[in-house]
Amino acid sequence: MSRQDVQRLLEEYQVINELLATLQAQHTTVSELLEELTTALDGVRLLKTEGGERLVHIGAGLFVLGTFNAREVLTPLGAGYHAFLDLENAERILKERIDEYSKVKTSLEENIEKLIERAAQIRQVLERLGIK
C-alpha cells in the first residue's frame, strides 16, 4: 500500500468520524422530538377522555392542576402558522409526524451503522500497517 493510499485512508477515517458526530447529533435531536410528539399524542388522547382533573406541565418542572373540556387544540401547521383543530385531527397529525420522524430516525440509525462498519474496516487496515 502506497503512502498516498494510507493518506487517503486516514482522511476517509477522519471524514467518517466527523460525519458520525453529525449524524449522532441529528439522531439525538430526532429522538428528543419523537419523545415530545409522543407526549403530545398522549396529552391529546387524555383530553379525549371525559372528566377528571389532570396535572399539566407548564415548563421548568412546574405543573398545574386543572379540569379540561377542550374539544380543540391549537396545533402548529408549519412556517409559524397555527390552527385550532379538533382532537381527532390533532391526533392524526401527531401520528403522521411520529411516523415521519420514526422513518428519519431509522434512516439515521442505518447510516450510522454503515459508517461505524466502514470506520472499523479502515481502523483494522491501519492497525495492520502499524498506524494508530
UniProtKB/Swiss-Prot annotation:
Q: Which GO terms describe its cellular component?
A: cytoplasm; prefoldin complex
Q: Per the annotation, which location comes first and is thus the protein's main one?
A: cytoplasm
Does the keyword field hold Amino-acid biosynthesis? Answer: no
One GO molecular-function entry: unfolded protein binding
Decide whether keyword Oxidoreductase is in the record.
no
Keywords noted in UniProt: Chaperone, Cytoplasm
Q: Into which family does the record put it?
A: Belongs to the prefoldin subunit alpha family.
Q: What is this protein called?
A: Prefoldin subunit alpha
Specify the taxonomic lineage: Archaea, Thermoproteota, Thermoprotei, Thermoproteales, Thermoproteaceae
